[in-house]
Amino acid sequence: GVNTAKLSAIAPVRVDKNGVPFTAMEEQPGDSDFHQFSYMGEHRVLKQLPCWTCYTNKKVHETLKSGLADSPLYNGQIQSTGPRYCPSIETKLVTFPDKDQHPLFLEPEGEDTNEMYLNGFSSSMPMDIQLNALHEIPALRDAKIYRPGYAIEYDYFDPTQLKHSLESKIIKGLFFAGQVNGTTGYEEAGGQGTVAGINAALHCVGDKTFEMNRDESYIGVLIDDLTTKGVDEPYRMFTSRAEYRILLRQDDADARLTEKAYELGIAKRDRYDWWIEKKEAIGRIIEFCANYPIKKDEINPKLEALGTTPLRAGCKLIDLIARPHLNLTNLSEIIPDLKAALETPANRKEEITEAAEIKMKYKGYIERERLIAEKMHRLEDIKIKGRFNYSELHEISTEGRQKLERIDPETLAQASRIPGVSPSDINVMLVLLGR
């Protein structure tokens, strides 16, 4: 059957901004430099609202400690594991008893509401304890709250019982996505929902499934981690979980996913054409830089003015771009032909210039990571599901045999990522497969 277990989540108190003396807090302004994953349409920047910082103190800690016996996290009511990276305020006090203060961040919930999210003050304690503790903070002495912090416990389903399409291995045609798979976070849930929704639709019309590899998207990394390794705590996606981070850049999300989306019918023709125009423009810039000759006598005075080492011999423009202090923008100011090459198409100059420069400046790193990914793809092509009776495969380690039997991986690459399955176990399987 479908295996279930429990995890927990905890939320912070919501404060009414009316009556909060922001002059007693440190302002944290919003971003001023904005990037986007989609370059289509008008680049609209929403009004940035500041956040505010304050700190707990010894009196706050004493008040909270007096209520520990009433905290479900510490009186046995909630025993399951919560998110590692956003512990409750009571957990901070217990884990770090030597700390006299902890930072709190007052964050607006929106432009048209007085409700503010007190990040850092998640709690499962009774409301009166939370309120008394807040009032010991000078900036929140007169604070009123909309809702106290709270903790919940919830069921999740073992994600190792899912295929990479997020279809259940147990019940055909049933797809799982989001918190029920043991993840925490909006983007994590949204990414799974996208993949599960696509595959549910494909399943209904009898088409083959849609899956993403670890070198294609962070969604691919997340789903592979869930289905291969499982979870014993709420799973949060971090860039550090991806071994192919250089291939999963902000500037190349369209390069990785637009054509796949168009083939699936979830991206319209104008988006596809938008990407093709960009791809061709990037190619033209790279070709121009790879073939454009630079004469040292002409360029050296200009390089010295930019604070970089002069050339000892002539080179191609692409070689200059590899230098740390040089980029297409400052080089275009001293090389008129380059400036002209960057102007087409004029309405997309910034995004295309950035993408072309990254591909040239980091070419060696990108190609090296691509080769590593391609080697792993060869293992992805070796299907092993149903080809071994793991309980009788005594040539591999006991732990590896048990893990393989429980997870039943689809491919040899997936098997290699299962904790407890060693490289020697993979080699044994390769030999048995005649590879």
Q: Where are the regions that the model predicts?
A:
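Extended, charge-enriched "interface" segments that sit outside catalytic cores
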Residues: 241, 258-427, 431-434
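Internal hydrophobic alpha-helix adjacent to the cofactor/substrate pocket in enzyme cavities
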Residues: 189-212
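A glycine-rich dinucleotide-binding beta-alpha-beta segment and adjacent secondary-structure elements
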Residues: 105, 117-181, 211-224, 349-403, ...
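An anion/pyrophosphate-binding glycine-rich loop and adjacent beta-alpha core
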Residues: 1-131, 223, 228-312, 317, ...
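Glycine-rich loop(s) and the adjacent beta-strand/alpha-helix scaffold that form part
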Residues: 1-14, 137-138, 142, 195-203, ...
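Glycine-rich phosphate/pyrophosphate-binding beta-alpha loops
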Residues: 179-187, 243-245
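Flexible, glycine/charged-enriched surface loops at secondary-structure junctions
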Residues: 74-81, 140-148, 207-212, 296
